[in-house]
C-alpha cells in the first residue's frame, strides 16, 4: 500500500473514531433522559450515568464485527433522537406534552424501522429491466444481464450468490457481464470458488464476461486467495476476463472490457475502439462511471457500470454527485448516441444496509434493426 493511501486511510479511521465517540456521548445523554435513569440519578447520579454509558457500550460491540455498520447505526440513532428533539421543541412551542420517555421510544422505533427497511433492501435482490433500441443491425435481439458489486461475504455468500444465478438463468440471457467488485478483501476463498462455479452453470448464447473493479485485486494482504487465483477460478468456469480488451461477438456486436481506473496502464476509450466496425453495436464495460465524456466521444453505443452502489446509504448518492465523484449514481442516461447504465449492484461494500437504494441485477433487452 502506498504512503499516500496509508495516510488517507489513517485519517479516515481517525475521523471515524472521533465521529463514533461524539455520537456515543450524545446517545449516552439521550439514554440518561429516560425516567428510570432520572429516578436513579436522584439517589445514585454516578451509577445512573454509568448504566446509560453501559447500554451504549453494548452497541459498541458491533465494532468487533463491522466498524462501518456500527457507524451507520450510531449516525441513524443520533439522527432519530435529534429529529424527535426537534419535534419536542415544536410541541413545546404549541404547549403540547411530549415526555422524554415517549420521545426516546419513538426515536428508537423510527430508527429501527428505517434501518430494518434498509436491511431488506440490501438482502432482497430485485430484477431491474431496461429496453433499448438501435438502428444498427444485430443477428438477433440481445438480452444481457449486468451484475456488479457482489462484494461476496456481505449480503451474499457463495451459496446465496448461486441462488441468485438461478434467477438470472430463468431470465434466459444471451450474455451475462460481471461489471467489477465481484469479491472484496473480506471474501472467503470458499465463497469465491462457489460463486465462480455458479457462474459456470449459466447457459447463455454468448457466454459470461468479467471486468475488474477497484476491490477485486484486494487492498490488503490478509485475504486467503490471490487475484491470480480469482482469475483462474473464473476462467476454469468458462468466464472470460477482459482487461482492456475488445472482442467481436458472433460477427454481430463488440464487447469491450476496460481496466478499472484504479489500475495502472489503463487504455483510453478511443484506443479501445480504434479499428472497430462502426456499423456494429458496441458495449463497453467500465466498473466506475467516471469517464462519460470520452466514452461518448468514442461513439460507444452502451456503457455499463457499477461501483456507486446506487448511493448505498442516503444521502451519500446526492453528495457524491454534487462533488462530481462520479458522472452518474444510478440508472440510465444518454449523451449523444451513447446510452449509459449504472446498476446499484447485487450487494454492496461492508454495510449490509441500503437506505439510498436497493440491491439488483439489470436485465437489458437490446432490439436491433
Q: What residues fall within each predicted segment?
A:
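Non-catalytic terminal accessory segments
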Residues: 1-123
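Generic preference for hydrophobic/aromatic residues in regular secondary structure cores
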Residues: 27-31, 127, 293, 303
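Generic structural signal for short, solvent-exposed loop/turn connectors between secondary structure elements
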Residues: 56-72, 92-103, 127-129, 133-142, ...
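Soluble catalytic domains of enzymes that build or remodel membrane lipids, polysaccharides, and related
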Residues: 136-369
Amino acid at each position: 500500500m502506498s504512503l499516500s493511501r496509508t495516510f488517507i486511510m489513517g485519517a479516515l479511521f481517525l475521523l471515524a473514531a472521533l465521529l463514533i465517540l461524539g455520537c456515543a456521548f450524545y446517545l449516552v445523554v439521550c439514554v440518561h433522559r429516560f425516567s428510570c435513569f432520572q429516578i436513579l440519578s436522584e439517589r445514585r447520579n454516578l451509577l445512573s450515568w454509568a448504566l446509560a454509558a453501559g447500554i451504549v457500550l453494548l452497541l459498541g460491540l458491533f465494532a468487533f464485527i463491522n466498524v462501518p455498520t456500527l457507524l451507520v447505526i450510531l449516525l441513524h440513532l443520533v439522527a432519530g433522537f435529534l429529529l424527535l428533539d426537534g419535534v419536542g421543541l415544536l410541541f413545546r412551542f404549541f404547549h403540547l406534552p411530549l415526555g422524554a420517555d415517549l420521545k426516546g421510544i419513538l426515536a428508537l422505533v423510527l430508527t429501527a424501522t428505517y434501518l430494518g427497511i434498509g436491511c431488506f433492501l440490501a438482502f432482497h435482490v430485485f430484477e431491474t429491466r431496461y429496453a433499448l433500441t438501435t438502428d444498427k443491425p444485430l443477428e438477433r435481439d440481445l438480452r444481457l444481464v449486468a451484475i456488479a458489486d457482489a462484494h461476496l461475504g456481505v449480503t451474499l455468500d457463495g451459496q446465496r450468490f448461486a441462488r441468485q444465478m438461478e434467477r438470472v438463468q430463468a431470465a434466459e440471457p444471451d450474455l451475462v457481464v460481471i461489471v467489477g467488485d465481484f469479491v472484496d478483501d473480506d471474501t472467503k476463498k470458499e465463497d469465491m470458488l462457489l460463486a465462480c462455479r455458479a457462474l459456470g452453470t449459466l447457459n447463455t448464447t454468448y457466454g459470461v464476461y468479467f471486468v475488474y473493479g477497484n476491490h477485486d485485486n484486494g487492498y490488503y494482504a490478509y485475504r486467503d486467495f490471490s487475484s491470480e487465483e480469482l482469475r483462474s477460478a473464473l476462467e476454469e468456469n468458462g468466464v472470460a476476463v477482459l482487461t482492456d480488451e475488445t472482442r467481436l461477438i458472433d460477427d454481430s456486436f463488440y464487447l469491450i472490457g476496460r481496466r478499472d481506473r484504479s489500475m495502472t496502464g489503463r487504455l483510453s476509450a478511443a484506443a479501445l475502439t480504434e479499428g472497430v466496425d462502426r456499423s456494429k453495436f458496441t458495449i463497453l464495460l467500465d466498473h466506475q462511471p467516471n469517464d462519460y465524456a470520452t466514452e461518448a466521444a468514442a461513439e460507444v453505443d452502451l456503457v455499463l457500470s457499477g461501483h456507486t452502489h446506487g448511493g448505498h446509504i442516503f444521502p451519500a448518492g446526492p453528495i457524491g454527485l454534487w462533488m462530481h465523484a462520479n458522472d452518474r449514481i444510478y440508472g440510465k442516461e444518454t449523451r449523444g448516441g451513447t446510452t449509459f447504465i449504472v446498476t446499484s449492484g447485487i450487494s454492496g461494500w461492508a454495510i449490509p444496509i441500503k437506505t439510498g437504494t436497493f440491491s439488483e441485477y439489470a436485465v437489458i433487452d437490446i432490439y436491433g434493426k
